């Protein structure tokens, strides 16, 4: 993950203001240490609740930055896919945590020693990596909302123009696409699109200007979308694609654990709300509570 996110450090753009709830973390650590659930086959709910809350906050922020309000069904799709991504992230996190339970002789470490060993690794999961994911969710949810507008306007503004990055230090890989104008349904947009690199700040604008030629790519292998970003979130509602390492290269049992957890705990299209004082979900039926039925409700 460090290699994947290496170039994503954001020193000039999105302000990723979040704090991972320590009460949730401490409950999760206690549960993992006491082996009250199986990290290979289950999803730790406190870690999930907090991760999903933060990714949802990023999505809210990104949508608020777009000039287009998305409809309820598309917002539900974003929320549901964010829940799936959060569950995969937590499966990776909880198994990384559990892998440090025993010393080199296979003996269970004392709880405080184990926590001391775990915290440097947790800094990656709940700080560095999550910050990159937060910033990316902000940018890509804004792009997703923009795409919804492009679809609605395509009878009047049928083409899209790739706009120059707003970054003070833009990467050279997208520069060849600046100024390209193509129809919204052109296959080019399936393989190249703003937001397919970590921390990309390029964008699209709808236009009735005539289409340009498809640009030649001198380095097609180098200009492939980054793993986890090789999709159009405005079409499928996934801010992180299925090629993300949490999903494509997860621990054994990750896909089955996530499938079971989502089916049991997450109503499609819901937003999860947690009472951190009690550590319990606010829905007494066994599934997480739907806290809104409208985008801004």
Residue locations for each model-derived region?
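N-terminal leader/targeting and assembly helices and adjacent pre-domain segments
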Residues: 1-122, 208-297
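Intrinsically disordered or highly flexible coil/loop and linker segments, enriched in small
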Residues: 38, 64, 106-107, 127, ...
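A broad, low-specificity signal for short, low-complexity segments enriched in glycine/proline
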Residues: 59-61, 120-125, 158-168
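Internal glycine-rich, Lys/Arg-flanked active-site/core loops of soluble domains
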Residues: 103, 112-115, 119-136, 140-156
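Conserved short secondary-structure elements within globular domains
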Residues: 137-210
């Amino acid at each position: 993950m460090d290699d994947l996110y290496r170039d994503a450090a954001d020193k000039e753009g999105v302000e990723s203001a979040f704090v991972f709830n320590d009460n949730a973390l401490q409950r999760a650590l206690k549960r993992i240490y006491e082996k009250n659930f199986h990290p290979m086959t289950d999803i730790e709910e406190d870690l999930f609740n907090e991760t999903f809350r933060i990714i949802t906050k990023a999505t809210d922020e990104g949508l608020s930055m777009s000039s287009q309000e998305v409809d309820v069904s598309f917002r539900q799709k974003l929320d549901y896919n964010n829940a799936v991504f959060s569950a995969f992230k937590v499966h990776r996190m909880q198994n990384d945590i559990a892998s440090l339970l025993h010393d080199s002789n296979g003996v269970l470490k004392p709880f405080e020693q184990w926590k001391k060993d775990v915290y440097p690794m947790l800094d990656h999961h709940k700080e560095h990596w999550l910050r990159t994911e937060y910033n990316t969710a902000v940018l890509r949810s804004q792009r997703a909302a923009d795409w919804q507008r492009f679809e609605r306007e395509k009878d009047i503004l049928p083409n899209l123009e790739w706009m120059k990055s707003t970054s003070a230090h833009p990467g050279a890989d997208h520069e060849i696409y600046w100024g390209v104008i193509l129809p919204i349904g052109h296959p080019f947009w399936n393989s190249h699109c703003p937001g397919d690199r970590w921390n990309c700040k390029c964008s699209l604008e709808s236009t009735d200007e005539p289409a340009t030629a498809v640009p030649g790519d001198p380095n097609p292998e180098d200009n492939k979308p980054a793993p986890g970003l090789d999709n159009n979130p405005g079409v499928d509602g996934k801010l992180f694609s299925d090629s993300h390492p949490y999903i494509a290269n997860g621990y054994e049992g990750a896909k089955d654990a996530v499938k079971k957890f989502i089916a049991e705990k997450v109503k499609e299209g819901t937003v999860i709300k947690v009472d951190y004082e009690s550590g319990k979900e606010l829905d007494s039926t066994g599934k997480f509570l739907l806290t809104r039925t409208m985008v801004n409700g």
